[in-house]
Design a protein with these regions (language model features):
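Vicinal oxygen chelate
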Residues: 2-11, 14-23, 53-58, 65, 77-103, 127-130, ...
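Acidic (E/D-rich), amphipathic helical modules within compact regulatory domains
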Residues: 28, 39-59
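Conserved active-site tyrosine of GNAT-family acetyltransferases
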Residues: 28-33, 104
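Short secondary-structure junctions
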Residues: 36-46, 107-116
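A short, acidic/glycine-rich surface segment
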Residues: 43, 74-78, 123, 148
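A contiguous binding-surface segment within folded domains or other stable secondary-structure elements
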Residues: 60-80
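Short Gly/Pro-enriched loop/turn and capping motifs at secondary-structure junctions
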Residues: 72, 97, 118
Length: 179
């Protein structure tokens, strides 16, 4: 793909979220809620393909955060998280996943994970690429996250689950293994 055509496709990308690999998901959620005012937007979801447990946080006027922890203690992700949180990736929304991948590869990126259903995204396709300078990029094809608290919360006098209740909500609805 010619550089100009690749750049035209990439101009349409929109930064969607920041992915942070954490050592302990529950603790990290509490930290971001307490120190920075984020609210938990989803119940934790286990991504069986990538072997991580994921939760999204939101804050008015800020990009969403995707916090995730490794579920396999000896995985490369678990080893990377042992010293604490790590900026793992920037995620971009695209409506042309294949074209975006082709464009990025033509400009020197390397595919780490080809398109596959993203369990935290209601199985809409996602892909991961290494773009150089130690940075990974996730490409997402939907802005709808699985396990949104507003949709998953039990009825409670017309309100949604409070951020402090989100981890309890996961336990009450039987965990997040039913993916």
């Amino acid at each position: 793909m010619a550089g100009t055509a690749a750049h035209e496709i990439l101009e349409g990308l929109e930064l969607d979220h920041i992915g942070i690999l954490v050592k302990d998901l529950d603790s990290a959620v509490t930290t971001f809620r307490t120190l920075f005012g984020y609210r938990q937007a989803t119940v934790p979801v286990v991504n069986t393909r990538q072997k991580v447990r994921v939760v999204f946080l939101e804050k008015e006027g800020s990009l969403p955060l995707k916090l995730f922890e490794a579920v396999e203690p000896n995985s490369a992700l678990a080893r990377a998280a042992r010293s604490g949180g790590v900026l793992h990736h920037l995620a971009y929304y695209t409506d042309d996943l294949e074209g975006t991948i082709e464009s990025l590869v033509s400009l020197g990126a390397r595919v780490l994970s080809p398109p596959q259903p993203g369990e935290a995204f209601d199985d809409h396709p996602i892909a991961f690429l290494y773009v150089g300078s130690g940075m990974n990029v996730e490409l997402v094809t939907t802005r709808d996250w699985r396990g949104r608290i507003r949709a998953a919360a039990p009825a409670r006098t017309g309100t949604t689950a409070e951020p402090a209740d989100a981890m309890d909500l996961e336990r009450k609805v039987g965990g997040s293994d039913g993916i």
